[in-house]
Amino acid sequence: MVPQASASVGVLFVCLGNICRSPTAEGVFRAQVQAAGLSNQILVDSAGSHAYHEGESPDVRACAAALERGFDLSGQVGRQIKAIDFEHFDYVLAMDRENLHYLRKMQPSDSQSRVALFLDYAEGREGQSVPDPYFGQADGFALVIDLVESAGKGLLKQIGRNLPKIKT
């Protein structure tokens, strides 16, 4: 997805396959952005560092855990990050250190995107990774939601400081 011309800020979440963590982050953060009334200013998307699940919907367990908490992941389709994403997204946020390393190697030298760990925006979780729930149980998916809710609040606060004020 390419950011809309009207969006001031683009945020891209990245995990390994784009079926568990990053689509959950996309869905949760999109809901937070909507609740803040900033949907026309912040574009939210997700991708995988690898194309293992390109074209697939998010993991059914991720969808179920999200829906249980009031977040909708339907309509999302897995895709692999491309170099051009660094031109379109201001924040390219990794779910773990391995993906962060991959993104930093991939990032074009002239890119202005902020590449960081998503949990750097969660108070008390700086430098930590969102654990991959893929091979685990349902509680792992619930933990992912807890973590991305917290980081999303911090990220939204950070972005809000830099958004142009809307005149009403």
Regions found by a protein language model. Name each.
Residues 22, 96-97:
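Helix N-cap/beta->alpha junction signal
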Residues 1-88, 157-168:
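Conserved active-site segments centered on acidic
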Residues 13, 93-94:
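Hydrophobic beta-strand core positions in alpha/beta domains
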Residues 3, 91, 97-168:
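Phosphate-binding/catalytic loops
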